[in-house]
Amino acid sequence: PPQYPEHVKPKEIDGIIITHAHLDHSGYVPSLFVSGHSRVYATPPTLELSRLLIEDMLKIEKNYHPFDIPEVYNMLRNSKEIGFREKVEKGNSSFELRSSGHVLGGGTVLVESGKKRLFYTGDINPKGSRMLPEADLDIGEIDLLITESTYSQTEQKPRKQSEEGLIDFANEVMDRKGILFVPAFSVERSQEIACVFRNAKFKHKIIMDGMALKVNEIMFQYPEYLRDPKIFADAINHSVAIRNDRDRKNALMEPCVVISPAGMLVGGNAVFYLQHLAFDSKNGIALVSYQGDGTPGKKLLETGKVSSRGHDMKVTAEVRQFEFSGHADRNDLFEMIKNVKGNPKVLTVHGDNESCIRFAEEIHERFGLEAYSPQVNETISV
């Protein structure tokens, strides 16, 4: 079940900035409108995608949530759309969002208060992707850097290597007259994978299904946030959208690639495709999303089994995993910190406790900056 930061009290908040739509950054915000009415600031696509993901979470997950649909709409009514590099004045401080390269509309946050300047990375991808431009890191001198640490202890494979590996795997599956199932996150990852296949001039049919189709529609509304809207449009227009069960069954009548949420195989149409494709050795399953502990995707990787009709069943389709992270890896993070101007204090967040602590130690060792991993509820002075 999700863990919510319920120690955060609505009446203590002057404003809320949503960096991007992923639920670990947006999913608690509606609860702040059960008894509060703060202003929410985010880019237009972030607000649209947040609504989509939060509503889907409430519909699918049966766990406890400290809010419901009325609070989601209350959040949206109290939201102000802002663009990148648009300065917002708030009391004696100001802030602006900068492109993060992580997900459509996703931003970093640059805050100025008096003579002090703070930069929060949120989730960041300095290199960008086929879909998104690289992060905007032209931020000037700063006094405090709050950086994600998700992959601070990991060096990722070059994206080109992952793309080529995926295409090679797909061709192998097509050669044996099978179907390749690519479970992918609905926001950005599904579209990125479609672009990878289109760029490779893949000859077989590409199927897209599930909430990724709604995300496609939102992305078409905001071409200015994409690296190249023509590349995105070309990839989506050359894919086949699944609209109902009949389409779904017909799609599996010939060799093809199926891109569909959920990325970790938790619910969504992934369950349908697993039941129909996982137990035939001609088929393939390409995992291109992070697989969290306790998820069916993680179970598949570790045991080679999935739950089917109440029983654990051995998967006979070929399973491979490919790295397509939207986060900065270890080298990206060190490069970003090396290029930061000023002599900032550094806080390492958004990683497991051990990674955050080790990353802070390494930052101090490499750059001589004061760095540490803060505790929940800790007050930081700059």
Placement of each model-derived feature along the sequence:
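Hard-cation-handling environments
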Residues: I167-S289, D293, H350
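His/Asp/Glu-rich metal-coordinating catalytic cores
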Residues: P1-I17, H22-S26, S31-I206
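Conserved acidic residues
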Residues: D14, D143, C256, N283, ...
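Glycine-rich phosphate-binding "P-loop"
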Residues: T147-E164, V182, P229-F232, V315-N331
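A general structural motif
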Residues: K157-S162, D234-D247, M264-V266, K299-G304, ...
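Short, solvent-exposed amphipathic alpha-helical segments in soluble enzyme
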Residues: V34, E112-G114, A135-D138, S162, ...
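A short, acidic, amphipathic alpha-helical segment used as a generic capping/interface helix at domain edges
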Residues: G268-L274, S325-V340
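Redox- and metal-dependent alpha/beta enzyme cores, enriched for Fe-S-associated oxidoreductases
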Residues: F279-K314
